[in-house]
From Swiss-Prot:
It is an enzyme of class 1 (oxidoreductase). GO terms for biological process: dimethylallyl diphosphate biosynthetic process; isopentenyl diphosphate biosynthetic process, methylerythritol 4-phosphate pathway; terpenoid biosynthetic process. The keyword Oxidoreductase applies. It catalyses: isopentenyl diphosphate + 2 oxidized [2Fe-2S]-[ferredoxin] + H2O = (2E)-4-hydroxy-3-methylbut-2-enyl diphosphate + 2 reduced [2Fe-2S]-[ferredoxin] + 2 H(+); dimethylallyl diphosphate + 2 oxidized [2Fe-2S]-[ferredoxin] + H2O = (2E)-4-hydroxy-3-methylbut-2-enyl diphosphate + 2 reduced [2Fe-2S]-[ferredoxin] + 2 H(+). Pathway: Isoprenoid biosynthesis; dimethylallyl diphosphate biosynthesis; dimethylallyl diphosphate from (2E)-4-hydroxy-3-methylbutenyl diphosphate: step 1/1; Isoprenoid biosynthesis; isopentenyl diphosphate biosynthesis via DXP pathway; isopentenyl diphosphate from 1-deoxy-D-xylulose 5-phosphate: step 6/6. GO terms for molecular function: 4 iron, 4 sulfur cluster binding; 4-hydroxy-3-methylbut-2-enyl diphosphate reductase activity; metal ion binding. Binds 1 [4Fe-4S] cluster per subunit. Its EC number is 1.17.7.4. The active site is at E187. Isopentenyl diphosphate binds at H96, H185, S317, S318, N319, S379. This is 4-hydroxy-3-methylbut-2-enyl diphosphate reductase. Catalyzes the conversion of 1-hydroxy-2-methyl-2-(E)-butenyl 4-diphosphate (HMBPP) into a mixture of isopentenyl diphosphate (IPP) and dimethylallyl diphosphate (DMAPP). Acts in the terminal step of the DOXP/MEP pathway for isoprenoid precursor biosynthesis. Its cofactor is [4Fe-4S] cluster.
Length: 398
C-alpha cells in the first residue's frame, strides 16, 4: 500500500482535521484549571527547589507535559467544544495519563474498547467524530474510519509523524526498518503500519542478536522464534537484513537508541565495507527533543544527593518508565506512581517497581531531614505533580 498517498488524500478530506478548530481561547481556562499549577511555577522560579521543614524537594529541570501532549489535549478539548452534540470517540487513551483520560470521560468522550488486544470499532457510526491520540493510529484504523464516513481529528505528535516519514523512506528504497520500540505499544504499532519490511527490537540485547545473525553467528530457527511477533509478514532474516534503516519509538531511552544505531552501522560496515556502507545502512535522527530533554534532566537530577526519587506517570507510559530506569540504574530508592493517591497518610506508598506488579512499601518517607527528587513523564500535568508534593509535605509534618 502507498501509505504516503493515502495520508496525502486523507489530509485533503473535509472530514479530517489536524490543526484544531480555532477555539484555543475558549478552552484555555478549562485547561489551566485542570492541569496547571501555581505551586509548580513557584518551584521552577526558585531553582526547581522547595524546602518545607525537614523536607526538601528537588524537581528535574524538564518534566511533565511536552508540547505534543499539550497540543493533543487542547485539540481534544476544542473538539468537544466544536462538536457539542456529536458522539466523540478516541481510538485509545489520548495520552498515557489516567487523570487526563478521566477528565475526557467526564466530558462524554467515548473510548474504543479493546478485547483480546483488538480494538472494537463496531459502535462507531457514520458522522461520529473520532480523535486519533498523540501517539498516532495505524494506517488500517485510519482507512476504516475514513471509509465509514467519520470526522477524524488527528492529534498525532509531529515527532511521531516524522518517524512515519522515515520508515516510508526506508520502504521506498527497499530497506528494512529496524524499529527500536515496544512491539505492542500503540506508537510502534502505528509506525510499523507505515513501514514496508520491518523488525522491532526492544533493547540493545535484542539488537545484538540481530547484529550477530547478520554476521553469520545466529540460528535461523531460534531467530524466528524470538522475533516471530515483532516483524512484518513474510519476514526472511536471510533476505531482509541486507539493507537496514533505523527508526525508533520516540519515547525510548535516547542513549540506547543511539547505541543501537551505532551497533547496526558497525555491523553493516563490518559485513559490506566502507565503500558500500551507504548502500546497506541509512542513518537516522528520530529521537524526540522532549524525550531527550526529560532524560537529560533526570540524569542531572540523579547526580545530585537525593534520598529517594518519585517518578510520576501512567504505568503504561514508556517515557516515564525510562525515567524510572535512570534512577534505578544509579541505585536510588525510586517509586513510580501514576496518581498522588498512591501516597498514603500512614506513610506507605503503592508503587510499581520496574518489570513488576504494584506493591506497597511501608515507612516510605524516612525520618529526619530528607531530600526527595521528583520528575514526571511527558503525559503528566503539573497539577498532578503539585498534589504529590502536597502529600509529601503532609507526611513530613507528621
Amino acid at each position: 500500500m502507498d501509505t504516503h498517498a493515502f495520508k496525502r488524500s486523507l489530509h485533503h478530506s473535509d472530514r479530517y482535521n489536524r490543526r484544531g478548530f480555532g477555539r484555543a481561547d475558549e478552552v484555555a481556562g478549562s485547561l489551566e484549571q485542570a492541569y496547571q499549577s501555581s505551586l509548580i511555577g513557584s518551584i521552577r522560579d526558585n531553582g526547581y527547589s522547595l524546602t518545607h521543614g525537614r523536607l526538601k524537594v528537588r524537581l528535574a529541570e524538564a518534566f511533565g507535559f511536552c508540547w505534543g501532549v499539550e497540543r493533543a489535549v487542547a485539540m481534544a478539548y476544542e473538539t468537544r467544544r466544536h462538536y457539542p452534540q456529536e458522539r466523540i470517540w478516541i481510538t485509545n487513551e489520548i495520552i498515557h495519563n489516567p487523570s487526563v483520560n478521566d477528565h475526557l470521560r467526564e466530558m462524554d468522550v467515548l473510548f474504543i474498547s479493546v478485547e483480546g488486544g483488538v480494538k472494537d470499532f463496531s459502535g462507531v457510526a457514520t458522522g461520529d467524530v473520532v480523535i486519533l491520540p498523540a501517539f498516532g493510529a495505524t494506517v488500517q484504523e485510519m482507512q476504516l474510519l475514513n471509509e465509514r464516513g467519520c470526522h477524524i481529528v488527528d492529534t498525532t505528535c509531529p515527532w511521531v509523524s516524522k518517524v512515519w516519514t522515515t520508515v516510508e523512506k526506508h520502504k521506498k528504497q527497499s530497506f528494512t526498518s529496524i524499529i527500536h520500540g515496544k512491539v505492542k505499544h500503540e506508537e510502534t504499532l502505528a509506525t510499523s503500519s507505515f513501514a514496508g519490511t520491518y523488525l522491532v527490537v526492544l533493547d540493545l540485547e535484542e539488537a545484538r542478536l540481530v547484529a550477530d545473525y547478520i554476521l553469520g553467528k545466529g540460528n535461523r530457527e531460534s531467530f524466528m522464534e524470538r522475533f516471530s511477533k515483532a516483524c512484518s509478514p513474510g519476514f526472511d532474516p536471510d533476505r531482509d537484513l541486507e539493507h537496514l534503516g533505523v527508526a525508533n519509538q520516540t519515547t525510548m531511552l535516547k542513549s540506547e537508541t543511539e547505541e543501537i544505531g551505532r551497533l547496526f552501522e558497525r555491523t553493516m560496515l563490518s559485513k559490506y565495507g566502507p565503500t558500500d556502507l551507504n548502500e546497506h545502512f541509512l542513518a537516522f535522527n528520530t529521537i524526540c527533543d522532549a524525550t531527550q530533554e526529560r532524560q537529560d534532566a533526570m540524569f542531572s537530577l540523579v547526580d545530585e544527593t537525593v534520598d529517594l526519587m518519585v517518578v510520576i506517570g501512567g504505568y503504561n507510559s514508556s517515557n516515564t518508565t525510562h525515567l524510572q530506569e535512570i534512577a534505578v540504574s544509579r541505585g536510588i530508592r525510586s517509586f513510580h506512581i501514576d496518581t498522588p493517591e498512591r501516597i498514603h497518610t500512614d506513610n506507605s506508598i503503592e508503587h510499581k517497581p520496574l518489570g513488576e506488579e504494584l506493591t506497597v512499601e511501608e515507612l516510605f518517607l524516612p525520618s529526619g531531614p530528607v531530600t526527595v527528587g521528583i520528575t514526571s513523564g511527558a503525559s503528566t500535568p503539573d497539577r498532578v505533580v503539585e498534589h504529590v508534593i502536597q502529600r509529601l509535605i503532609a507526611l513530613s509534618e507528621n
